[in-house]
């Protein structure tokens, strides 16, 4: 669905205003994963696009569905209409669900729509203030994020912790996953209201993130846990900055990565030793070739040496690669060098030519390719 074209066709907004709403809509999925709130962007329809009296659709709504980000024409609720009239953030209740609604203003200061956050009915009254802080911070991120920054945002899971703190380092919000993670790390005090520095988190880069307003990611080790810490600063105004701190337990991923590195090192060592053994065999055959006085024996031994060295070459190349894949061109170039050294006399002028694209193949296939090139 072309969201921008739909906005242009059904609302009085111009291209620049449409581009702004379309830009904000790119963060709906990310925003919902952080807030666990339903996020909708709305703007008034053209009068000719409004539904009949029975449906009375008067707003174009941009939201997430199973098909992705879509637009649909809806009847705006009282909170939405009030926002369009006075342009101030509002808290409303629609269908027994709490909504936090914030204005979207274009460069000319005109209110062109709003962002609505619908809070889950399971949220308790004592959590309302924190939920509003969460909505307020998220809507500022949606309004201020650049295209480059949006590309770096990835939805978080239910198991990821989320903390919001301000430029005075006071924690304003912490979701349940964050409380559990920080508790595991040994922080036994109330999270919200305390200083981010009083926690057990390793957050030495906080001031730099707040001052420079740049995204920062690090992996920190806490005893037997590895936590990826992703900080996203948000400019709430000229003199206020808040920061999302996403905590992701990547202990399992880190262990798997370490295991892969160990396995890769072992594989490279095996290839290196196989190469040495093959070269030893080739050396023994070369000694036998020197001792023999029969030309046909020398030729047979030399052919065997070439085959063995072609296989040793593959293992040598793999032992220097981080992956168990080799470029055919690399095999060809090295094999031609060996063949030139062992078979081409100084008075001969032999040219080797490679034509075609280079291809990556597994070390298993590379052994066959090297033998084929050797025979050719």
Regions found by a protein language model. Name each.
Residues 302-306, 313, 325-342:
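Short beta-to-alpha transition helix within the HATPase_c
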Residues 279-308, 321-324:
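Histidine phosphotransfer helical core of two-component systems
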Residues 265-279, 283, 287:
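Conserved phosphoacceptor histidine of two-component systems
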Residues 28-93, 171-192:
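Structured interaction and signal-relay segments at domain junctions
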Residues 89-108, 112-117, 195-252:
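PAS-family sensory/regulatory modules and their coupling/dimerization elements
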Residues 254-267, 271, 326, 343-375:
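Conserved short strand/loop->alpha-helix "switch" segment adjacent to the catalytic nucleotide/phosphoryl-transfer site
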Residues 20-39, 139-171:
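Sensory modules in modular signal-transduction proteins
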Residues 113-151, 236-273:
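Sensory coupling linkers of modular signal transduction proteins
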């Amino acid at each position: 669905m072309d969201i921008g074209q739909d906005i242009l066709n059904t609302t009085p907004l111009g291209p620049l205003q449409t581009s702004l709403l379309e830009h904000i809509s790119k963060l709906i999925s990310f925003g919902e994963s952080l807030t666990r709130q339903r996020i909708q962007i709305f703007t008034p329809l053209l009068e000719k696009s409004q539904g009949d009296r029975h449906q009375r659709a008067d707003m174009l709504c941009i939201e997430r569905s199973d098909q992705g980000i879509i637009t649909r024409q809806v009847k705006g609720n009282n909170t939405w209409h009030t926002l369009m009239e006075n342009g101030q953030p509002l808290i409303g209740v629609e269908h027994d669900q709490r909504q936090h609604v914030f204005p979207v203003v274009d460069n000319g200061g005109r209110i062109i729509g709003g962002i609505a956050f619908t809070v889950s009915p399971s949220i308790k009254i004592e959590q309302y203030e924190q939920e509003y802080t969460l909505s307020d911070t998220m809507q500022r991120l949606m309004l201020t994020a650049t295209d480059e920054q949006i590309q770096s945002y990835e939805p978080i899971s239910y198991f990821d912790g989320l903390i919001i703190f301000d430029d005075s380092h006071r924690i304003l919000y912490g979701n349940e996953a964050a409380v559990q993670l920080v508790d595991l790390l040994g922080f036994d005090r109330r999270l919200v209201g305390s200083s981010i520095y009083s926690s057990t988190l390793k957050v030495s880069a906080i001031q730099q993130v707040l001052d420079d307003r740049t995204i920062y990611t690090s992996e920190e080790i806490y005893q037997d846990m590895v936590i990826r810490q992703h900080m996203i600063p948000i400019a709430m105004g000229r003199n206020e900055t808040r920061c999302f701190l996403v905590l992701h337990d990547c202990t399992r991923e880190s262990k798997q990565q370490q295991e892969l590195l160990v396995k890769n090192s072992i594989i490279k060592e095996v290839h290196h030793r196989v190469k040495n053994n093959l070269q030893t065999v080739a050396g023994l055959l070369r000694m036998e070739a020197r001792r023999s006085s029969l030309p046909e024996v020398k030729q047979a031994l030399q052919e065997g040496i070439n085959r063995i060295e072609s296989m040793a070459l593959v293992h040598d190349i793999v032992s220097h690669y981080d992956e168990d894949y080799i470029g055919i061109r690399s095999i060809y170039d090295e094999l031609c060098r060996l063949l030139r050294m062992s078979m081409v006399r100084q008075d001969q002028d032999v040219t080797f030519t490679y034509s075609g694209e280079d291809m990556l193949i597994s070390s298993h296939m590379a052994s066959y390719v090297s033998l084929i090139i050797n025979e050719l």
